[in-house]
Every structure is written in structure tokens, then in C-alpha cells.
A protein has these predicted regions:
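ATP-dependent phospho-/nucleotidyl transfer catalytic cores
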Residues: 34, 109-171, 215-219, 275, ...
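Active-site acidic catalytic loop and adjacent metal/ATP-binding pocket
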Residues: 61, 154-199
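ATP-binding glycine-rich phosphate-binding loop
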Residues: 1-26, 37-38
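Active-site beta-strand-loop-beta-strand hairpin of nuclease catalytic cores
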Residues: 25-28, 180-182
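Active-site Asp-x-Gly
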Residues: 180-226
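ATP/Mg2+ or Mg2+-diphosphate-binding catalytic cores
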Residues: 242-284
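ATP-binding pocket architecture of kinase catalytic cores
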Residues: 26-107
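A glycine-centered beta->alpha junction motif in the catalytic cores
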Residues: 73-89, 120-130, 237-260
């Protein structure tokens, strides 16, 4: 379908998670299922804005036959993206740069319900196993404990901010791995959600894969638009670890992928203590 619809002739096609990708003349293309609620015109506008903002370093949508951007195959819709990304690590400025304001947001409440369900589902699923996943058994209580503290704090904030918080369009980092640099500049990875969530996910990315630049972190405390208590709550919730647990129990990933979370527990705790002190957060 790729050659017929896009006039591209890759020698080999690869699959990763729920997408396929291939190379033509050293250019990388990614095909994903299109499940966005927003219309294609809105997505194209966002793509063009990102391309201009990043000076040509964001991924772009590729039209097919008849200048159609959405391709239907076996009752599903797909979009083809050409990857234009700098081969470097993601920076805090990237997250700030791509954030766009949007009103009428209830993301905190939606995230709260999503997180509660995720933990319930994981705890239920793990009852099916005995000694199959020793690394999970050794670490799950610790990470769920942190996450439940985050849920408790988000619940308090959700009640206090009902119909008051301003929403944003943020860049979403879906996975913590060394191959996700291109995710940031992909228009399909922009979503309506809390700005603090984007910042928390960026910090997790730095802790688990790289190192924390504390000079860079000072910029967060200079931004008076950030709700530091909410950011702290999102830091407590271990979304990447828990998402990987789900994938492991579904045989989509190997258990060894959670090693980075286990090995960096002290580094993560040190950052939580640093952030709580800087933001004057008292959980007692």
C-alpha cells in the first residue's frame, strides 16, 4: 500500500509497537494509525506551526494519492510522517518552546482517573503470576507507593482547581528509551494536557536516561505559571515504569527494560527531595 499510495519504494519495512517505519534515500518515514479526535485540517495547521517554530526540524505529514493525508486500509485510518529531527537529546527549552495555550481544560481530573485505573488493573493482573517476573516483584511496591502519593495529591488539586485551570497543548514523550528523540517534534504527539505533566515527563527522561542538569532546572523555578505542587504530584506518579509493567505482562516487552528505573531509584529520590525543598513543598 505504501508504493501505490505514496510512490515510495522502501527495501525493508520495520515494525515497532503500533507503528511501522522505513527508509527511502536515508529519509525516515513512520506510518501510524490516525486516532486523533481533531480534524486533519487542525493537525496540518499544528504541523506547519511546529515546522516553522523548529526551523524545519519537526516531522511533517506526507500526502498520498489525490493529496489525501489520511489513508484508509482494512477499516482503519493511517497517516504517513516524514521524520525531520536533530540527533540530540531533548532539552527543557524544547518542551517550553512547543507548548501552546488552550482554554477549558480538565486534564488533571482525567489523568487522576486514568492513573487510578492503571494501578488497579496492574495489581489485578499481577495476581495471575507467581515468580515469573522477579524484578517486578522486587520493585512494584516501591513504585506503586510513590504513585499512590501522587494520586492523593492530584486528587486534592483536582478538587481545588475544578473548572479553574487553564489548559495547554503539550509535547508528549510517550516512551523512555534512547530512540525517542523524534517523538518530541511529531505533531501526532501533541496533546491537550497539563503543562506540569510535560515538564515532569521531561525530568523523568533526564533522570532515567541521562543526567539532571540542575542549572537547567532553575529555569522551572523562574516560571511563575507553573503549579509546583502539581508538577511534584506528576513526578511522584511513575507513569513510565507502570506503562512498561503493562507491556511486560502483555508480552510486548522484556522484563529487563525496568532495570533503568530500579537502578536510578536513589537518583530519583534525591531529585524529589531537591524539588520539594526548592518549591517549599511539605507533604506532612
Amino acid at each position: 500500500m505504501i508504493s501505490e499510495n505514496y510512490n515510495l519504494f522502501p527495501e525493508k519495512i520495520y515494525k515497532k509497537d503500533n507503528e511501522i517505519y522505513f527508509f527511502v534515500n536515508d529519509d525516515k518515514y513512520v506510518m501510524r494509525e490516525y486516532v486523533k479526535k481533531s480534524g486533519i485540517d487542525e493537525l496540518l495547521q499544528l504541523s506547519n506551526e511546529m515546522y516553522e517554530k523548529t526551523k524545519g526540524n519537526s516531522s511533517v505529514l506526507i500526502p498520498g494519492v489525490g493529496n489525501n493525508y489520511v489513508y484508509e486500509y482494512k477499516r482503519k485510518k493511517y497517516i504517513l510522517i516524514k521524520v525531520n529531527s536533530i540527533e540530540r537529546n531533548i532539552l527543557l527549552d524544547d518542551i517550553i518552546y512547543l507548548t501552546r495555550s488552550k482554554s477549558d481544560n480538565d486534564s488533571t481530573t482525567k489523568n487522576l482517573e486514568k492513573y487510578k485505573k492503571q494501578i488497579d488493573d496492574i495489581e489485578t493482573k499481577l495476581l495471575e503470576f507467581n515468580k515469573e517476573y522477579p524484578k517486578i516483584q522486587q520493585s512494584i511496591d516501591y513504585f506503586i507507593g510513590l504513585s499512590e502519593n501522587g494520586i492523593q495529591l492530584l486528587g486534592k488539586l483536582s478538587r481545588e482547581e475544578k473548572n479553574q485551570n487553564e489548559g495547554t497543548i503539550i509535547a508528549k514523550i510517550e516512551n523512555i528509551d534512547e530512540y525517542n528523540n523524534e517523538e518530541l517534534n511529531n505533531p501526532l504527539n501533541m496533546e491537550k494536557n497539563d503543562y506540569e505533566l510535560a515538564l515532569a515527563n521531561y525530568i523523568k527522561y533526564r533522570i532515567y536516561l541521562l543526567h539532571v542538569d540542575y542549572d537547567e532546572m532553575e529555569n522551572i523555578f523562574r516560571n511563575d505559571k507553573i503549579n509546583h505542587l502539581k508538577l511534584y504530584a506528576y513526578l511522584l506518579y511513575q507513569n513510565y515504569y507502570l506503562s512498561d509493567i503493562v507491556k511486560i505482562t502483555r508480552n510486548k516487552k522484556e522484563e529487563k527494560i525496568i532495570k533503568k528505573y530500579i537502578d536510578n531509584r536513589k537518583k530519583y529520590l534525591d531529585f524529589l527531595l531537591y524539588y520539594a525543598e526548592k518549591a517549599k513543598i511539605n507533604m506532612k
